[in-house]
Amino acid sequence: MVDWTDAERAAITSLWGKIDVGEIGPQALTRLLIVYPWTQRHFTTFGNVSTNAAILGNPKVAQHGKTVMGGLENAVKNLDDIKNTYAKLSRMHSEKLHVDPDNFRALAECISVCVAAKFGKQAFTADVQEAWQKFLSAVVSALGRQYH
């Protein structure tokens, strides 16, 4: 269990309240597939993801980005039980999809870049980023729990 201060909880929930999952999710997943091209192998059912232009125009990438952000919303709503919130998803990514857990860190980084670009230094202050990174680290850790 992660120990959250009241200030961290407030920063995470406030930032989350400003995030448009339909904007940030597709941007973050698109960025992941472009910046870390080896992750494309996990998305073969999405059709063409072989070029930057194909990724940018792929509606399945955009939809899955929204799905990912919906999963993050579950963590925001369950800050005190992130590990159990992600147990089933961790098992699926480990046993069925065989996703390298380092990819979760890469996606978290892409989400942070997109959030920082969207909100800038006025809203995404160092204090907010500190809480946000702690939150994403907890999510990444929870997603990696079921790996052998």
UniProtKB/Swiss-Prot annotation:
Globin domain residues: 3-148
Alphabetized UniProt keyword annotations: Heme, Iron, Metal-binding, Oxygen transport, Transport
Cellular component, GO annotation: blood microparticle; haptoglobin-hemoglobin complex; hemoglobin complex
GO molecular function, one term: oxygen binding
InterPro entries, per the entry: Globin, Globin-like_sf, Globin/Proto, Hemoglobin_b, Hemoglobin_oxygen_transport
Expression (tissue specificity): Red blood cells.
Residues reported to bind heme b: H64, H93
GO biological process, one term: hydrogen peroxide catabolic process
Pfam families membership: Globin (PF00042)
Assembly behavior: Heterotetramer of two alpha chains and two beta chains.
Function: Involved in oxygen transport from gills to the various peripheral tissues.
Protein family (similarity comment): Belongs to the globin family.
Protein name: Hemoglobin subunit beta-B
Organism: Seriola quinqueradiata
